[in-house]
């Protein structure tokens, strides 16, 4: 019990270091990189920690630094900056992956879980050429987007919403109603290929 409490305390401290950073600029959204300390051993970061690649074998767990922030069971990585307020927009190049999840998660979500499996993460998932929403391991289909080269995510913290955006049409495809109770971070999972993030963007006009 004491060990579990200590782990939770360390995770909270890790998250607290990043609180408030995302809302310092009124016009631009959260600017982030991927946090290597959270990345599962099957994942490798690239392009100055803005992209992530999946490796079937990955690194030997013994060669990866042990820390409480790292995901141990699932190929997940979190961003390094938390959101506690405001409207934020970022994009993800998805053309090189056929199976992935993108969204947001509580900064202290369990590192033994996967985004979309628990009830403290909210994601859009792409698998078998179809899109779904995913929360607490429950999936619902999302229609009308196909597989574009790039998609956008619009986070509206106070409104408790996360939307998938069609970048080419600058329009919302689907909106997830969320239940934020504290700081959240952009979150990513993949099982093939690579994802590339683009953050620090203005919310497009009309969204």
From Swiss-Prot:
Question: One GO CC annotation, please?
Answer: mitochondrion
Kindly state which keywords UniProt assigns to this record, in alphabetical order: Acetylation
Tell me which residues bear N6-acetyllysine: 53, 130
Specify whether Lipid biosynthesis is a keyword of the entry: no
Entry's Gene3D superfamilies? 2.60.120.920
Cited InterPro entries: B30.2/SPRY, B30.2/SPRY_sf, Butyrophylin_SPRY, ConA-like_dom_sf, E3_ligase_FN3/SPRY, SPRY_dom
Matches recorded under CDD domains? SPRY_PRY_SPRYD4
Domain B30.2/SPRY: from-to ranges: 12-206
Q: Which residues carry this modification: N6-succinyllysine?
A: 139
Q: Which domain of life is it from?
A: Eukaryota
Q: Which PANTHER family match?
A: E3 UBIQUITIN-PROTEIN LIGASE MIDLINE-1-LIKE ISOFORM X1 (PTHR24099:SF16), E3 UBIQUITIN-PROTEIN LIGASE TRIM36-RELATED (PTHR24099)
Please report the name of this protein according to its UniProt entry.
Answer: SPRY domain-containing protein 4
What species is this protein from? Answer: Homo sapiens
Q: What is the lineage of its organism?
A: Eukaryota, Metazoa, Chordata, Craniata, Vertebrata
